[in-house]
């Protein structure tokens, strides 16, 4: 322990060098960040897919109502189409949030790499 302390004190007068473990720490930190980014993307796409699947079912119902030519069924299409539009808005919001979060992470990673900073920060969704 004393030898490493002496080496450390001597090393303070030199320019900072990367410890052999620093590369591993940076790689581990980047891997954790990558997992977080992929999890965020995956969860967002799953949420969007739920709305898209619901829209597929709603569109099928609208088509069936239209084909039936029964006035009550056709009049129900107004509500169904409004629901479809609401779902499309939700999907757009999810994709917009994903895009923004991904761009922030990418920019953060770029700045971190450029500055040589190995610290990471997380952003809330």
Curated annotation (Swiss-Prot):
Molecular-function GO terms, alphabetical = protein homodimerization activity
Q: Where is this region: Disordered?
A: 1-28
Has UniProt tagged this entry with the keyword Transferase? no
The protein's role, per its UniProt record: Component of the central CCA1/LHY-TOC1 feedback loop in the circadian clock that promotes clock accuracy and is required for sustained rhythms in the absence of daily light/dark cycles.
Entries under PANTHER family matching the protein: PROTEIN ELF4-LIKE 1, PROTEIN ELF4-LIKE 4
Quaternary context: Homodimer.
Question: What name does this protein carry?
Answer: Protein ELF4-LIKE 1
Q: Which organism is it from?
A: Arabidopsis thaliana
The taxonomy runs:
Eukaryota, Viridiplantae, Streptophyta, Embryophyta, Tracheophyta
């Amino acid at each position: 322990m004393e030898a490493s302390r002496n080496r450390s004190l001597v090393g303070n007068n030199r320019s900072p060098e990367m410890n052999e473990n620093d590369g591993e720490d940076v790689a581990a930190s980047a891997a954790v960040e990558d997992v977080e980014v992929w999890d965020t993307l995956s969860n967002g796409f799953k949420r969007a897919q739920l709305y898209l699947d619901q829209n597929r079912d709603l569109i099928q119902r609208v088509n069936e109502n239209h084909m039936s030519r029964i006035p009550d069924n056709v009049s129900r299409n107004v509500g169904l189409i409004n629901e479809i539009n609401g779902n499309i808005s939700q999907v757009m919001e999810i994709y917009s949030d994903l895009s923004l979060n991904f761009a922030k992470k990418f920019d953060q990673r770029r700045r971190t790499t450029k500055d040589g900073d190995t610290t990471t920060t997380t952003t809330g969704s």
